[in-house]
Swiss-Prot record:
GO cellular component: cytosol
Keyword Zinc: no
Primary location: cytoplasm
Protein name in UniProt: Ribosomal protein uS12 methylthiotransferase RimO
Domain TRAM: 381-452
NCBIfam families in the cross-refs: 30S ribosomal protein S12 methylthiotransferase RimO (TIGR01125), MiaB/RimO family radical SAM methylthiotransferase (TIGR00089)
UniProt keyword list: 4Fe-4S, Cytoplasm, Iron, Iron-sulfur, Metal-binding, S-adenosyl-L-methionine, Transferase
Compartment(s) of residence: Cytoplasm
Cofactor (UniProt): [4Fe-4S] cluster
Length: 454
């Protein structure tokens, strides 16, 4: 199925498809590359089988992501496609990739995706292209073409790129470069454009969203940005990647005072124990974890809390892990993502002693999941019998409507599965907000019946 064309130039011969691996920041890069190629006259197709060129936008955050990226690269080169590798693996292994997989036609770094059309032009002329800047410095603004799928009602809005922190386990600063924020005016302009396209929810993303603006305004400016975005006619605005140090009184007040900023706090805390956090090069966090969580719950009783955790970090002892379990039991997060430590070459954690065995790390991960499932189920049960506002997004194979309430972020949290009594076409609900009565809950999802379209 062909994507909607933005094209203003003469069509070119190549038909290009994209294969995406990794996070939503990578997805935004993909959408910009799609828009740029379409503008330059290339036919951008969502069906890889019909394309002769495939751009694989890769992830290199952890080993499993690299393995998936390599599988896709080899799959398409084996099919005889001309493959261009973009994203974090291109940035990470710009010399090794073409040497190890000579079938690759081009590389595009994380700070070079704006050059994708020129790269493809050169590839079509038979050149092997390595377009990877040593230090990524580019960030797209609202003027850069971007493909936004009209069949989706959620869009990610990048407010900054890169990171100035140096967490011991994280390779991202080396792959994405230093922090560079967009101006408030640029972000608001893009939000207004997305609203005109029918987007019902925008999700603000960067490596550290609460550190937004530090580089261009001299201080973190998320609160000011939220106050301006609250004036845009987008029903839901969600923030991902908020760090405790940046959740100031002003930021929390912006959440409270804005009707369309949903009270959903995504806090990648990684751990609870001071010793582990110190080893992670996050010593500032231990004293803040407890107080900031208590403050959020006190100021915004309806707040939904999500966190991500790492188990099996070098030096994590049994008592450290028990501290983490007690932390989870005490604060009862709505959603938790848990990952086993992945040693990444180029990070300080790669060389740390006292490795935790994979067997122990996997057992700890399973333990966290088990504890959190019980907490999540209890949390979800509290919604049974209540009425909730739901964004309906799709129809399931079982002919049920699938949507989300504000307490579920797309892709990473649960969904709300809805039945309909009215004998009308289910497609009429897609992309709309409805009021629903919640009738059942499990540890992941809610179930309910639609009352009316809002």
């Amino acid at each position: 199925m062909k994507q909607n064309s933005l094209n203003v130039k003469e069509k070119k011969l190549s038909k290009v498809a994209f294969s995406h691996v990794g996070c939503e920041k990578n997805l935004v890069d993909t959408e910009h590359m799609q828009g740029l190629l379409d503008k330059e006259g290339y036919e951008v197709d969502s069906n890889i089988n019909d394309a002769n060129v495939v751009v694989v936008n890769t992830c290199s955050f952890i080993e499993t992501a690299r393995e998936e990226s390599i599988r896709k690269i080899l799959e398409y080169t084996n099919q005889g496609k001309e493959v261009i590798v973009a994203g974090c693996m291109a940035q990470h292994f710009k010399d090794e990739l073409i040497r190890e997989i000579p079938e690759i036609k081009g590389l595009v770094g994380t700070g070079d995706y704006q050059k994708i059309a020129k790269v493809l032009d050169r590839v079509e002329q038979g050149e092997i292209v390595n377009e990877v800047s040593k230090i990524p410095e580019f960030i797209a603004d609202e003027e850069m073409p971007r493909f936004v799928d009209k069949n989706k009602f959620v869009a990610y809005l990048r407010i900054a790129e890169g990171c100035n922190y140096n967490c011991a386990f994280c390779i991202i600063p080396k792959l994405r470069g230093p922090q560079r924020s967009r101006t408030i005016e640029s972000i608001v302009s893009e939000a207004k454009s997305l609203a005109k396209k029918g987007i019902q929810e925008i999700i603000l993303i960067s490596q550290i969203t609460t550190n937004y603006g530090q580089d261009i305004y001299g201080k973190p400016s998320l609160a000011k940005l939220l106050n301006e975005l609250s004036k845009v006619s987008i029903p839901w605005i969600r923030i991902h990647y908020a760090y405790p140090t940046g959740l100031t009184d002003e930021v929390i007040r912006a959440f409270k005072d804005s009707k369309n900023i949903v009270p959903y706090f995504d806090l990648p805390l990684q751990h609870s124990h001071p010793d582990v956090l110190k080893s992670m090069n996050r010593p500032w966090q231990a004293s803040l974890n407890e107080s900031i969580l208590e403050k959020i719950r006190e100021e915004i009783p309806s707040a939904v809390l999500r966190t991500s955790l790492i188990v099996g970090f070098p030096g994590e002892k049994k008592e450290h892990f028990e501290h983490l379990l007690q932390f989870l039991d005490r604060h009862k997060f709505d959603h938790v993502g848990v990952f086993i430590f992945s040693p990444e070459e180029g990070t300080t954690a790669f060389h740390l002693p006292n490795k935790v065995s994979l067997e122990v790390a996997e057992a700890r991960k399973d333990n966290v999941i088990s504890v959190q499932q019980n907490i999540s189920k209890d949390k979800n049960q509290t919604y049974v019998g209540s009425k909730m506002k739901i964004l309906v997004e799709k129809i399931s194979d079982n002919n049920e409507l699938i949507g989300r309430s504000y307490n579920f972020a797309p892709e990473i949290d649960g969904t709300v599965i809805l039945s309909v009594k009215d004998k009308i076409d289910l497609k009429n609900y897609i992309g709309k907000f409805v009021e629903a009565n919640i009738t059942f809950a499990d540890e992941y999802d809610l179930y309910g019946e639609i009352i009316k379209i809002l």
